[in-house]
Amino acid sequence: MSNMMKALVKSKPEVGLWMENVPVPEVGPNDVLIRVKKSAICGTDVHIWNWDQWAQKTIPVPMVVGHEFSGEIAEIGSAVTRYHVGERVSGEGHIVCGKCRNCRAGRGHLCRNTLGVGVNRPGSFGEFVCIPESNVVPIPDDISDEIAAIFDPFGNAVHTALSFDLVGEDVLVTGAGPIGIMGALVAKRSGARKVVITDINPHRLDLARKLGIDHVVDASKENLADVMKAIGMTEGFDVGLEMSGAAPAFRDMIDKMNNGGKIAILGIAPAGFEIDWNKVIFKMLNLKGIYGREMFETWYKMIAFVQGGLDLSPIITHRIKIDDFRDGFEAMRSGNSGKVVMDWM
């Protein structure tokens, strides 16, 4: 194996990514080197491409980015015992310290010292990625490489949707991006009564309909209260999944929640994001922030959802070769795509 590989690198502090030859990551005693077969583009990667304020504050330059992937093990460290060369795997992109209170209590997703693959350390937009053995997730034979490559965002959706009991509940999802749609699918499959998803992007709304969401609302044209009445809802929503990061959508959600309703919040809010906190108080709402996946219960559940028949393939709207990565990022930046999966093989 050559000691060099091609990778997408944030090599300059400006808009874009660049394909370069970089050293293959070194494998420590407890590490696993994975030959990447498929990579998916995340919204985080778009922020890095755009070199926005968050990226400028967060991403060291140069950096191999990317964190959504699947592949097979190419090399294992001397102390690795659970995996073998050639095994099909994906990986958890949040690397935790294992020493803080939350880690030692089995709540690794709450680690204060989390490092992000492709954010704080070299990522998966390369021919190889190296992660600790503890972050490796084996992929069953009945799950394809491209579905495994989108398990990271699917895990965000599963973590968000399963934050609260859904059986018999009426659920509102604000934001029909890929994660919002997958969250709505999880809610529907988990026994929710009514599942309503809202957005203002026609392409995303069409994609939600294509994937079988029953009640798809264009918030720029339709009144949510009228939709609730039309589908037989006499009280507010029991559970809200906020995936948009848009203040108008979140405010509308708060207005439409039943007293005592529960809201899981994954959408990242911009500066100046304002809501009416008196409504939160007097409606006695329960708000929960979500970041990443619960390790590794969320992974177990998302694998089970797919093996149980949940078809995520329509959420992948673009399949491209890695050398055409610019086309993939253009599709993502347009807002008119679902997931974009890039083939390294």
From Swiss-Prot:
Feature type site, description Important for catalytic activity for the proton relay mechanism but does not participate directly in the coordination of zinc atom: D152
Reactions accelerated catalytically: L-threonine + NAD(+) = (2S)-2-amino-3-oxobutanoate + NADH + H(+)
Keywords, in A-Z order: Cytoplasm, Metal-binding, NAD, Oxidoreductase, Zinc
Co-factor: note: Binds 2 Zn(2+) ions per subunit.
Cofactor(s) for this UniProt protein: Zn(2+)
One matching Pfam family: ADH_zinc_N
Pathway: Amino-acid degradation; L-threonine degradation via oxydo-reductase pathway; glycine from L-threonine: step 1/2
One of the record's GO molecular function terms: L-threonine 3-dehydrogenase activity
Enzyme class, broadest EC rank: oxidoreductase
Keyword Aminoacyl-tRNA synthetase on entry: no
The EC number(s) this enzyme carries: 1.1.1.103
Entry binding sites for Zn(2+) 1: C42, H67, E68
Family classification: Belongs to the zinc-containing alcohol dehydrogenase family.
Task performed by this protein: Catalyzes the NAD(+)-dependent oxidation of L-threonine to 2-amino-3-ketobutyrate.
Name the UniProt record assigns to this protein: L-threonine 3-dehydrogenase
Organism: Rhizobium etli (strain ATCC 51251 / DSM 11541 / JCM 21823 / NBRC 15573 / CFN 42)
